[in-house]
Amino acid sequence: MKVRTSVKKICSSCKVIRRKGVIRVICTNPKHKQRQA
């Protein structure tokens, strides 16, 4: 899980979702998981 100020899609299977007011990126590749700080 990467925590960064700007979350972006890295590949085509990345999805930007909002969970409890936190913007996250979920993907089939675990390395692409991100969360907004």
From Swiss-Prot:
<dbReference type="InterPro" id="IPR000473">
    <property type="entry name" value="Ribosomal_bL36"/>
</dbReference>
<dbReference type="GO" id="GO:0003735">
    <property type="term" value="F:structural constituent of ribosome"/>
</dbReference>
<dbReference type="GO" id="GO:1990904">
    <property type="term" value="C:ribonucleoprotein complex"/>
</dbReference>
<keyword id="KW-0687">Ribonucleoprotein</keyword>
<dbReference type="Pfam" id="PF00444">
    <property type="entry name" value="Ribosomal_L36"/>
</dbReference>
<comment type="similarity">
    <text>Belongs to the bacterial ribosomal protein bL36 family.</text>
</comment>
<dbReference type="GO" id="GO:0005737">
    <property type="term" value="C:cytoplasm"/>
</dbReference>
<protein>
    <recommendedName>
        <fullName>Large ribosomal subunit protein bL36</fullName>
    </recommendedName>
</protein>
<dbReference type="GO" id="GO:0005840">
    <property type="term" value="C:ribosome"/>
</dbReference>
<dbReference type="InterPro" id="IPR035977">
    <property type="entry name" value="Ribosomal_bL36_sp"/>
</dbReference>
<keyword id="KW-0689">Ribosomal protein</keyword>
<dbReference type="GO" id="GO:0006412">
    <property type="term" value="P:translation"/>
</dbReference>
